[in-house]
């Protein structure tokens, strides 16, 4: 999960890419005590994905509304696996 990019589309149509860093993952774990990120991937809960996007955008320097108002501005979240990122890099 660390190093995975998120493509986050907000309801205003703006699109941002932010990386799941250790800082983002730790913030997510603090907000979801007792839960593992791997379990989130297997048993998808929309609020957890929204919070991951929220933290990733904040850590990337994107100005977002405070949680939970951020949820109302969220349009879509796409996970970009590490392997696909490597494929898109020039030789």
What are these model-predicted stretches?
Residues 1-16, 23-91:
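Charged interaction scaffolds used for protein-protein
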